[in-house]
């Protein structure tokens, strides 16, 4: 597992959590998605998880969204044949934007949920962030995108 995080403080918390849980199959990279091609060979990733990435709600910050077509084109070569990008977010507008971006970039969408915790979807690994917002009654949006 490769965890990519641009915020050093968040990355340190993730490293500490992995140590606390005794996880030894995780590598950590402090940086942004633009750096991934330097570290990841083509056709080597089965799944990319975009869990609660920043929605950058201002239109002027759209280029920073991890589901912006610019980033989707970075991820494409890394995915194995049949590989998927799985996204979870609590932000409806970001989710709608993501659906549009994935579609424009040739991805096929599946397992779309507008309220993950009420959907009966099995196999969800709940993040701390997800637990927090779900417990406050916010729906969690989820999708899988494949080429």
Give the role of each language-model region.
Residues 94, 98-147:
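Class I S-adenosyl-L-methionine
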Residues 65-84:
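A short glycine-rich, Lys/Arg-flanked "PGG" loop and its adjoining helix->strand segment in the class I
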Residues 14-47:
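S-adenosyl-L-methionine
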Residues 7:
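Conserved SAM/SAH-binding beta-strand->alpha-helix loop
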Residues 57-62, 86-105:
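Conserved class I S-adenosyl-L-methionine
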Residues 39, 45-66:
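A short SAM/SAH-binding and catalytic strip from SAM-dependent methyltransferases
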Residues 1-4:
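Short beta-strand element of Class I
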Residues 10-13, 95:
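Short alpha-helix immediately C-terminal to the canonical SAM-binding loop
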